[in-house]
């Protein structure tokens, strides 16, 4: 069995150096790079886009973003956009966040499991290019879809890891 190796990046490095690390990892056969999003230091999405732009094969993953600070439309369109940059190489790693940090920015994480389930269900349906209506405790959308006018309309292969 072939070993699977990935690179995990947080915020201890300069972003420009991160580009070099990811290219190095890709050239050495690493399967993936995971970009952390933690505390209030570094967003994961911007580095992921940069990594996608300078690589050709390595999978680009969020490790992890939270399901509270981006609405479901923004979350889905963000991962659609990343998939446009790196088709079939994007993975959405998503978690329920850290309660002390959530509270400090005014977010009450009630029923985190229910909120996560709703997020994942609607996100996957939107990335499958479905028109979605969903009425839950945390997500309420009526007849929305990713409004791709120009570009790829096919369902996107963006795995969601919890």
Predicted regions located by residue number:
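Generic structural signal for well-ordered secondary structure
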Residues: 18, 41-44, 68, 75, ...
């Amino acid at each position: 069995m072939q070993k699977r190796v990935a690179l995990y990046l947080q915020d201890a490095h300069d972003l420009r150096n991160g580009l070099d690390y990811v290219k190095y990892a890709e050239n050495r056969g690493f399967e993936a790079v995971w970009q952390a999003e933690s505390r209030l230091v570094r967003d994961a999405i911007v580095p992921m886009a940069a990594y996608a732009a300078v690589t050709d094969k390595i999978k680009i993953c969020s490790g992890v973003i939270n399901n509270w600070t981006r609405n479901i439309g923004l979350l889905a369109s963000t991962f659609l956009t990343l998939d446009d940059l790196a088709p079939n190489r994007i993975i959405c790693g998503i978690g329920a966040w850290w309660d002390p940090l959530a509270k400090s920015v005014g977010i009450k994480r009630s029923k985190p499991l229910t909120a996560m389930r709703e997020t994942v269900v609607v996100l996957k349906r939107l990335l499958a290019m479905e028109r979605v209506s969903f009425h839950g405790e945390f997500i309420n959308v009526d007849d929305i879809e990713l409004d791709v006018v120009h570009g790829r309309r096919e369902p996107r292969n963006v795995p969601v890891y919890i």
